[in-house]
Design a protein with these regions (language model features):
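Contiguous, often N-terminal, cationic amphipathic patches that form binding interfaces
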Residues: 1-63, 68-73, 77-105
Length: 105
């Protein structure tokens, strides 16, 4: 794979006593429904109804990922990709098994 690709899809980083899952996501703004699931080029696909204007799609994607992992919105942090459809997120307190489940949807 070329070096510019965002891999791996996820990794677990231990931060003190709390596990953090780092996830690469591919945001698809302007979708008919908000949905998290499936994969695209090694990234978790996040479909949001919000348009990619003024950070609305990014905010909607962070909220959707939080709901999909069963954590509060403030537990999801944008690490990279604020102006890109491909983003790296950190999800504090997430179960890594949830990511496996979401990738197979």
């Amino acid at each position: 794979m070329p070096p510019h690709r965002w891999t791996p899809v996820w990794k677990i980083a231990e931060s003190g006593h709390t596990g953090v899952v780092r996830v690469t996501v591919r945001v698809r703004p302007g979708s008919a429904h908000t949905r998290v699931g499936g994969g695209h080029d090694g990234a978790l696909v996040v479909r949001v109804t919000a348009r990619a204007v003024g950070g609305q799609a990014t905010a909607a994607a962070l909220a959707a990922v939080a709901e999909a992992f069963g954590v509060r919105r403030h537990a999801v942090t944008l690490v990279a990709g604020a102006a890109s459809r491909t983003k790296i997120l950190e999800v504090a307190g997430a179960d890594p098994a949830a990511l496996d489940r979401l990738l197979t949807l």
